[in-house]
Structures are given as structure tokens and as C-alpha cells.
């Protein structure tokens, strides 16, 4: 078995007694002080995550027309200095990956999921899009939480929400994956120490991928491989708002048919008021409509179990019945985000 890839911050993680997990071929910190504590750091103050395992690709703006044929969102009319969340779709309209684009005057930075990095690169090359893969030559740090911008204003210019900035050292955006405000910062390995020294001397706490997952779930954000996959379209995942590309793109015929007919599987958010947790793969029914849990966990903030479930078609009731280890547990579909 090949050795795991190591983050450029691996020695920092060891020094700070991180517990590691193998994620998409990378050895990454799962937690330091514990997932619940780290979850609380980000919800109440600030925390920072090493997300250097995520793929980072530069694409020249001359490729935008070709790139537009592969994603469901309108990147052609994206302003310089803005970020865009979008989804690469296949010919069936399903998700190859969900990604973030940062657009600058002459190029775009594409950030993709670690597990899909090779797949996205191959997909771009297959469609003759020239790229510059920069994952190994950079690090990516996410600083998140209600106090994160106040903290980082002592170090960087703070852009508007969903905007991106590039200076001589840092390329960053006011984006994130926690439901809190914050920055995602890309930096060359030569300049990484300055950023980490600032963060470690500040009030921000290091956080691992365990808290990142509970935070994203609590914020009603999808995770590729669970709420999105090569068998789930953006429409089925409740991400119709991302479909802003008015031109033809790969799988757009399928997606438009789903929008017009409503005939498709559908993802729903749910809560369970008891202590029972409906985890990934748990069977669930909404009346006679069967479904399966894609993600489920306990919410430290809401003090209840929450999750996503994928149903074969639109449920006719919000009342749910889960089969949790042979025991029937009641829950309900909710229409709003878990956290407002």
C-alpha cells in the first residue's frame, strides 16, 4: 500500500498532538482537543483548519468558454475578484465534483475535493483545457468563526463576502465550509510559516476534519460522496440555485428535464429529537416513500440529531421513521437550514 500524502503542516500537527485520519490518501488531523470542543471554537470564536489536501488548479481565463461547458453555473459573467461555488456534471447530469472558483484578472483558481482531484484533472484534460496543478507547491488554510475576520484583519485585507484577493504572498477568499464567516488562504510553502506563526500566536485554535464535518452538516452543506455523487444531480441534492448556466453544458438536458418534470429522487434535511443518531446508510421512510440517510450526526449546538436523507421521490409527509439497528425511531423533515 502506498504511503499517505503528507500536508506541509504535518510536523505542526504532530507537535500539537493531533489525532490523524487517512482521508483520500492523505494523512490529515482528525482532531486536537476533541471534535466537540473544536466545533465550539468555530461557532463561538475562531478556529483554523489545514485543508491542504484539497486540490488546487490554476486555469487561464482564456479557457472560460470551454470550462463553461462542463459546469452548471454561469462562470462567464462572474466578476473578477469574486468566488463561485459550482458543480462539474457528467453526461447524466450527475456530480463529478462540487468546487470553488476564485476569479482574477488573468486566471482562475479552482479548488476541488481531495478525493476527486485526479478525476477533475483528468476531466479537464479530456476536454482539452490547459491547467497548472499547484496542490503540492502550496498550502491551504481555512480560518473560520465569528471572530475570524476581526482576528485576520491584523494580518490581511478583508474582502467582501464571496470575494477573493491576490497579493504578492497570499491568494485568499472570504469563503468557507462551516456556516461561519472566514477566509480560505492559499500560500506558497516558502511563506507558510509566517501565516502559521500569526495564527498560533492569536486566539484561533487548530481544528481537525472531524469538526469540519459536524460544522458543515450543521450548516446544511453537502459533502461529495454523500449528498452529491456520480449518481446524484444538483437538482436531486437541493442545489438548483447553482444551475445558473443558461448555455448548454454537460448533462444540462437531464437537469432541465428534472427541473421541468419534478420526476427525480430528492434530498431532505431531517431532525431527530431523541439521542438516536441516524448515520449514513440508515433506512428511512416518509409514509410509503423509502429513502436512505446520506449523512447523520449529533449537533452540539442544536442538542439533537440531524442529517440528510435521499428519497426515491418527493415525500408526501414530513414525518419520518428510521430503522436504527432494528429499532424504529421517529424524526421529521425540516425545510429551513439547521442553523439560521
What does each model-identified segment do?
Residues 1-24, 28-30, 36, 101-340:
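Conserved, structured C-terminal
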Residues 69, 74-127:
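Well-ordered mid-protein domain cores that form the structural environment of catalytic cofactors
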Amino acid at each position: 500500500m502506498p504511503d499517505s500524502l503528507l500536508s506541509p503542516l504535518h510536523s505542526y500537527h504532530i507537535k500539537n498532538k493531533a489525532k490523524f485520519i487517512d482521508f483520500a490518501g492523505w494523512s490529515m488531523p482528525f482532531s486536537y482537543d476533541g471534535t466537540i470542543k473544536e466545533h465550539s471554537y468555530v461557532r463561538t470564536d475562531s478556529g483554523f483548519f489545514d485543508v491542504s489536501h484539497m486540490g488546487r488548479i490554476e486555469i487561464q481565463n482564456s479557457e472560460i468558454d470551454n470550462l463553461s461547458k462542463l459546469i452548471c453555473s454561469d462562470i462567464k459573467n462572474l466578476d473578477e475578484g469574486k468566488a463561485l461555488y459550482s458543480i462539474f456534471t457528467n453526461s447524466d447530469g450527475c456530480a463529478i465534483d462540487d468546487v470553488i472558483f476564485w476569479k482574477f484578472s488573468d486566471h482562475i483558481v479552482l479548488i476541488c475535493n481531495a478525493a476527486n482531484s485526479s478525476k477533475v484533472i483528468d476531466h479537464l484534460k479530456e476536454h482539452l483545457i490547459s491547467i497548472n496543478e499547484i496542490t503540492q507547491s502550496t498550502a491551504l488554510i481555512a480560518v473560520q468563526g465569528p471572530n475570524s475576520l476581526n482576528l485576520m484583519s491584523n494580518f490581511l485585507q478583508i474582502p467582501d463576502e464571496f470575494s477573493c484577493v491576490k497579493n504578492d504572498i497570499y491568494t485568499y477568499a472570504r469563503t468557507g465550509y462551516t456556516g461561519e464567516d472566514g477566509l480560505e488562504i492559499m500560500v506558497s510553502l516558502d511563506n507558510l510559516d509566517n501565516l502559521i506563526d500569526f495564527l498560533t500566536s492569536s486566539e484561533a485554535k487548530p481544528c481537525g476534519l472531524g469538526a469540519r464535518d459536524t460544522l458543515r452538516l450543521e450548516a446544511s452543506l453537502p459533502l461529495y460522496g454523500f449528498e452529491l455523487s456520480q449518481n446524484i444531480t444538483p437538482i436531486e441534492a437541493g442545489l438548483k440555485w447553482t444551475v445558473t448556466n443558461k448555455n448548454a453544458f454537460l448533462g444540462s438536458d437531464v437537469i432541465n428535464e428534472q427541473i421541468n418534470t419534478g420526476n427525480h429522487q430528492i434530498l431532505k434535511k431531517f431532525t431527530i429529537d431523541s439521542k438516536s443518531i441516524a448515520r449514513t446508510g440508515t433506512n428511512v421512510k416518509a409514509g410509503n416513500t423509502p429513502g436512505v440517510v446520506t449523512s447523520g450526526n449529533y449537533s452540539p449546538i442544536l442538542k439533537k440529531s440531524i442529517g440528510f436523507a435521499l428519497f426515491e421521490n418527493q415525500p408526501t409527509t414530513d414525518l419520518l421513521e428510521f430503522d436504527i439497528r432494528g429499532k424504529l425511531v421517529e424524526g421529521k423533515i425540516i425545510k429551513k437550514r439547521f442553523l439560521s
